[in-house]
Amino acid sequence: MDMIKSCTSVKLGATCRREGTTFQVWAPDAVHVKLALYESPGEYNEQGLVTDHESGTLYLMERNGDGIWSAVVNRDLHGTYYMYQIESADGGVHYAVDPYATAVSANGCRGVVVDLAKSNPPGWEQDVRPKLLKPTDAVLYELHVRDFSIHTDSGMKYRGKYKAFTEGGLRDSEGNTIGLDHLEELGVTHVHLLPIFDFRTVNELDGYATGSLSREYNWGYDPQNYNVPEGSYSTDPMDPILRIRELKELILALHAKGIRVVMDVVYNHTYTVDDGPFERLAPGYFYRKDGYGHLSNGSGVGNELATEKPMVRKYIKDSLRYWAEEYHIDGFRFDLMALIDTTTMKEIVSELRREVDSSLLFYGEPWTGGMSPLTEQTVKGSQKGQGFAVFNDHFRHAIKGDNDGHGRGFATGEPWYEGAVVEGMMGSIHDFALHPDETVNYVTVHDNLNLWDKILVACGMEEQAGLLRMTDGKLVNGGDVWKATAASTPYAGIPDEDVMSAAAVRRSLLANGIVLLSQGIPLLHAGDELLRTKFGDHNSYRSGDAVNAIRWSNKKRFKPVFDYYKGLIALRKAHPAFRMAAREEIEEHMEVLRSSDRIIAYRLTHHPQDSWGQIVVIVNGNEHEMTVDLPPTPYRWSIVVNDRQAGTDTIKTLDQGVIAVPGLSLMVLYEDQTQKKQGLTTVEIEYERRDEAYDGWNVWVWGTGVEDGGVPFSRVDGGKARAVFYAASGTKRVGCIVRLNDWEDREGENDWFIDIPPEEAKVRISLLSVKDDGSEGQEQRDMAS
């Protein structure tokens, strides 16, 4: 253990300089280690693999006492291929790719020495991260690189590639934005990319040409070379430098649009053990074992990385630091984060925020894929106060129901979920979160049925929609998937002339509308704003482009849906009251008004950074219109979100204290303090104390017909203070008490009542305190019209 601890500060991998390259690798049990250099990537077999590595030029490596083997080659090796030759105690000889390699040949068969400065695109040194003040300011958008552009209707030159994200100015036949400009117009702050490190299950040599509709497809949760970009997204996987440059171009293009990049990382398992990145160098060390000495399987794919071990922890932290520094990655989403011990997660967050960038975002799945012997699992609750967030499956279930079946939630028609939805909308601070920035709120992501398909299934519409039955990327009964998707009718029943009237559309907007109007960090699945379908495939990890590709033609067909998403995101970004960072803020400024009969209503009041003093959000899960009482106020209400449109502009104003909310819809209103309701009487109380000690004094009023409760005094000229409130038309008498703070003291022993004469526009009352000099209080009435 002392040996291992001393290794955790050593820089491993290949360090390339013009004068020479240093190689360092940790292989503690090896008898001999040699560096093998090659001029070519080797001979590929039919499976796209290089299995013969005997042709390299060998260099002896020296071992120090810590199990680290080193070699220096005194020349510029940029672009040279390399491997490590490992001789074990039993005499066996194996070749291994450097787990710290930053470039590899096609399909990751050999490492490549690279001078990373030569991979930088123009403008890279001037790249800056878009501003992010706090995690709850984020709006996340989960997206697969290939899905984004591969369909022919995208009109992109670099379909399926990193470079598709650099293509600006694209429009459809009706002038709607496509691709990169679409993301900017939508308003998301972060694009969360599914795995972009080198993964195993796609042969980069099979149909890698731009726009190829090859069957080769995978989400990428099968890691091979953790510190290298995936080659199938490059325009030429045979060029080991090009994939690095093109990924940097992607990040540069998104940053230029004000969009940050989150990387989906999989440090819980590798695709294989024997042929994976670690086992040949440190047999038995990197993988977790059960009590019988067998590989544990908490990932569900046959192995788990032993993150609690020092050199595994070092590897993960080094890898994350590399991506954040070299690629300017802005955040990380951790797959099956419960398989990463909490000590490692805490160190990741604290060290990278302290030493790289304080605004880096960290979040992940707080569950496993099976039983694990790890005792210190990063599950819901373990994130409290630690600076990272977790996916909120409680909220997800309350909104939509189960993942793949007919189970329903609030947005899909089930009663009794109001309380669970309210809990989620309050940032789950009374559930598992200490603060709202610890919960990632979402309805669907890449796993399971996507939102549109889930709504169809939950509402019993799958046969009408012609949803497919698929498993492992194939139709259950055989056949061509492209033909099957073309014959499917997932949008049957949506009238082209009035998209927003369809119940399924309204349910989809209700579901993600709840997410976007909740405290916490919202996450959307790419294409939800276009009513994206995966044709009923609940596990499309290898189902190919026919199922997974985003259909950009949906934008002009469902433009009102896109506009609604765009408006909700703009509303959230414009008003800090929707993005509170601390539980104390929520407890002070958020009040639940109603949570029953499939109606949820809450108000946000007097948030100090928000220009709107009072905001009311109403969610109607009924299929019919419901009437909801609004909080009393002397001002008119301005509606900015209804069942047809959303944003920050006023749709309609109203004087009434009730509102009719259409079925399956959202309503957002704010108190417009520039427009006072008609027929109100202003009541002004002028309060005088000889000691002029007005701090904490307020007037408690009731019977106003507008807004009852405490009204603070504000100091005015002449050593006096003034409180102003309003009485509704027809009010005859208003009660009041002058008190200190929350009833610590009061003026007089009896309640006071103020008569409100009809037709009076203003009533003034003057009070002289009896508390500071012992004299009798004096009262003077001044009626003013």
Task: Label the model's feature ranges.
Residues T15, E19-V31, E591-P631:
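Carbohydrate-binding surface patches
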Residues V25, Y84, L143, L193, ...:
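Conserved, mostly hydrophobic/aromatic
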Residues R146-Y327, M337-D357, L361, P373:
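Substrate-binding/active-site clefts of carbohydrate-active enzymes
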Residues M1-R18, Y44-N45, T51-G56, N64-L170, ...:
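The feature marks proteins involved in alpha-glucan
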Residues S508, I514-G520, L524-G536, A549-I615, ...:
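Glycan-recognition and catalytic regions of carbohydrate-active enzymes
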Residues V114, V349-A526, L530-L531, N539-Y541, ...:
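Conserved alpha/beta catalytic core and glycan-binding cleft of carbohydrate-active enzymes
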Residues Y38, M500-V505, L509, I550, ...:
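C-terminal accessory region downstream of the catalytic core in glycan-modifying enzymes
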Residues A27, G79-T80, K652-G679:
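C-terminal beta-strand-rich structural cap/linker in extracellular carbohydrate-active enzymes
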